[in-house]
């Protein structure tokens, strides 16, 4: 009986192990197509505490958007030949964190496949257009001083000198600071012998200094 107990205790940890799904990654063997992935992170700090709202997201061809906390963040991919498959968001006091990402080609349809010519155009012309729109009634932001109405800042366009090679960003009147990060990578890079170099772009209004972007707490919306 004691021997049986020892055997069961030895086998118990293995009985709870979960194996990863076996995906067919032969799609990466295609000689005339490349499979590129994309991740876009946006961190936006508003000028007042966030409203309690339900997260809503939409994914469309070459772009996606998410709304939460009184802010809508939309991302459009121009000349990138890429699509998003997931959208996530996390809020904390006065800040919205959003993530837009694609999935590996062996896990989802449609795939982000492109020809070599498309890849060249991507590296030269891809624009990640990020637009932050406030969903708070603008009439609430008017203030009266000596019976004169003071108009809020309608739109704040980021100076071109601060924009990276891929990111173009425009924020609405309620946004104080924005940080954005873009990564375009070879989804088959860990499988094939020669991978395509990763493209990265980073932008922040925080004195141009890189900041750590919160990623782990972002949940799918």
From Swiss-Prot:
Q: What's the domain of life for this entry?
A: Viruses
Native source species:
Monkeypox virus
| Covalent S-S links between cysteines | none
Signal sequence segment: 1-17
- Carbohydrate attachment residues: 72
Under the cellular component aspect of Gene Ontology, which terms does the record hold?
Answer: extracellular region
The UniProt record describes its induction as:
Expressed in the early phase of the viral replicative cycle.
Q: Which UniProt keywords apply?
A: Early protein, Glycoprotein, Secreted, Signal
Q: Which Pfam families match?
A: Orthopox_35kD
Q: Which SUPFAM superfamilies match?
A: Soluble secreted chemokine inhibitor, VCCI
Return the similarity comment.
Belongs to the orthopoxvirus OPG170 family.
> Where is this gene product found?
Secreted
- Protein name, as recorded: Protein OPG170
Q: What does this protein do?
A: May interact with several cellular chemokines to interfere with chemokine-glycosaminoglycan (GAG) interactions at the cell surface to alter chemotaxis of nearby responsive cells.
Q: What is its main location?
A: secreted
Q: Per its UniProt record, what InterPro entries does this chain match?
A: Orthopox_35kDa, Pox_vCCI-like_sf
